[in-house]
Regions:
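NTP-binding/hydrolysis catalytic cores, primarily Walker-type P-loop NTPases
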Residues: 1-4, 9-12, 109-110, 122-128, ...
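Pre-Walker A adenine-sensing motif
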Residues: 10-22
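Conserved ATPase "switch" residues in P-loop NTPase domains
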Residues: 23, 51, 162-163
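Short hydrophobic/aromatic beta-strand immediately N-terminal to the Walker A/P-loop
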Residues: 28-32
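Conserved P-loop
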Residues: 34-100
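Loop/turn-to-beta-strand initiation segments
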Residues: 56, 88, 128-131, 164-172
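Phosphate-binding/switch loop-helix module in NTP-utilizing enzymes
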Residues: 97-164
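Phosphate-binding/switch region of NTP-binding enzymes
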Residues: 167-169, 173-240
Length: 256
């Protein structure tokens, strides 16, 4: 029997049952989906539930402001301000452009070798989280526009840092459409999918007749057992994301 303290739960209704044990601690989990699927809600909800378990969470936003994210949480009934007061939650907005510039400067000093230190260009030193959310890798990638080499180096260093510190991380990545349906998984951002220990995909679903809904799938979780199914989800006010583990997608539909 695995030790319970080796795993984390998201606390999202119906989701954790899809795993045999849970999300392994210290692993990097990619949260992928197209616009409007609920990626940020998934991560905000997981962050809040993790804080309720007494664990520190750092939510790093590269798009929305701290006030905006707190407002989102409050709308769902998640008391972000209370968690901040208790020292369990920190939501901070970062500039992806500043990070890209810092990486370029460090690479110049290191003569373009893999000697940059992610810690010096990203993470605060006065907060020691067990869980980090990065929202989003897509925003960071856009700041490295035309500099794929530098972005790859940064991502490799980021994953190494998270692994070294044994920090469980949820990394949001937006995709224009599911990239693995009907073929080999493709990652337009190079090594991200390979480096991630897990991939959770959230979808918009369009059924025949035009009805719309949502779905979620665990695509990958290295070394762990999980249900290989795509199941229905809903996003409800005052509840957040709800997963229906016994409602597998059936019939004619398109994932977007």
């Amino acid at each position: 029997m695995p030790k319970k303290d080796k795993y984390l739960k998201t606390g999202i209704a119906g989701f954790d049952i899809l795993f045999e044990h849970g999300i392994p601690k210290g692993k990097a989990i990619l949260i992928e989906g197209s616009a409007g699927t609920g990626k940020t809600i998934f991560c905000l909800q997981t962050a809040y539930n993790t804080c309720r378990m007494g664990k520190k969470v750092l939510y790093m936003s590269f798009e929305e402001s701290e006030d905006s994210l707190i407002e989102h949480m409050e709308q769902f009934g998640w008391d972000a301000i209370e968690m901040q007061k208790r020292g369990l939650l920190r939501i901070t907005r970062f500039s992806a452009i500043d990070i890209a510039r810092s990486v370029e400067a460090l690479l110049s000093e290191a003569k373009k070798e893999l000697l940059i230190t992610t810690e010096t260009v990203l993470f605060p030193h006065d907060f020691d989280p067990e869980v980090i959310v990065i929202d989003s890798l897509t925003a960071i990638a856009s700041a490295f526009s035309g500099e794929d080499y530098r972005f790859r180096i940064y991502i490799e260093q980021l994953f190494r840092y998270l692994e070294k510190k044994k920090i469980t991380s949820y990394l949001i990545k937006e995709t224009p459409a599911p990239t693995h349906i009907g073929g080999v998984y493709k990652d337009e951002h190079g090594p991200i999918a390979f480096l991630a220990d897990g991939i959770i995909c959230i979808y918009n679903v369009v059924y025949t007749g035009g009805k719309r809904g949502g779905a979620i799938e665990i695509l990958k979780m290295r070394g762990e057992s999980f249900k290989k199914i795509t199941v229905k989800i809903e996003i409800k006010s005052k509840s957040g994301l709800i997963v229906y583990p016994n409602q597998e997608l059936k019939g004619n539909y398109v994932l977007t």
